[in-house]
Amino acid sequence: MSSERTFLPNGNYKIKSLFSDSLYLTYSSGALSFSNTSSLDNQKWKLEYISSSNGFRFSNVAEPNKYLAYNDYGFIYLSSSSNNSLWNPIKIAINSYIICTLSIVNVTDYAWTIYDNNNNITDQPILNLPNFDINNSNQILKLEKL
């Protein structure tokens, strides 16, 4: 897997699940989940390319000093620390990406995976799991530029 830059312009995005095609990544009450679309800032994500690291960082528009990061248990959460917050979006189709962990690309590729509870991803965690699969719709996200 290459860690070359995927071209994505800096700016605000909504992150939509391809699995449901109608649910968006939402930050609410200290937790991340997927819910129906709204115009609130808690569903808007600022994407910023960090050239010194050749990776991208996501921050929530409602909480601009917090970043999407992963912990040792594989959970993706909003953190006030920039540790473990660099990502490599791999484009697989128009506006469709698998988002991999930048720090461990070329070792075992880890990617965002939406936990699926009987075909219902509402209020389910987002995990950083090994072995991404372009055929796994739980790992494919649409980035909609605002």
From Swiss-Prot:
Residues making up the signal peptide according to the UniProt record: none
Protein location: Secreted
Coiled coil segments of this chain: none
One Pfam family of this chain: Botulinum_HA-17
InterPro entries for the chain: HA-17_C_botulinum (IPR008903), Ricin_B-like_lectins (IPR035992)
Main location as per UniProt: secreted
Gene Ontology terms: cellular component: extracellular region
Keyword Cell cycle: no
Disulfide bonds: none
Domain of life, source organism: Viruses
CDD domains, alphabetized: beta-trefoil_Ricin_HA17
Alphabetized UniProt keyword annotations: Hemagglutinin, Secreted, Virulence
Any further remark recorded for this protein: This protein can also be encoded on a prophage.
Record's function text: The hemagglutinin (HA) component of the progenitor toxin protects the structural integrity of botulinum neurotoxin; may increase internalization of the neurotoxin into the bloodstream of the host. The HA component is involved in binding to the upper small intestine through interactions with glycolipids and glycoproteins containing sialic acid moieties.
Subunit structure: Botulinum toxins are produced as progenitor toxins of large molecular sizes of 12S (M toxin) and 16S (L toxin). M toxin consists of a non-toxic, non-hemagglutinin component (NTNHA) and the neurotoxin. L toxin consists of the M toxin and the 3 subcomponents of hemagglutinin (HA). HA is composed of subcomponents of 70, 33, and 17 kDa. The 70 kDa subcomponent undergoes proteolytic processing and is split into HA-55 (also called HA-53 and HA3b) and HA-22-23 (also called HA3a). Preliminary crystallization studies show a tri-lobed HA-70 where each HA-70 contacts one HA-17 molecule.
The name this protein goes by in its record: Hemagglutinin component HA-17 type C
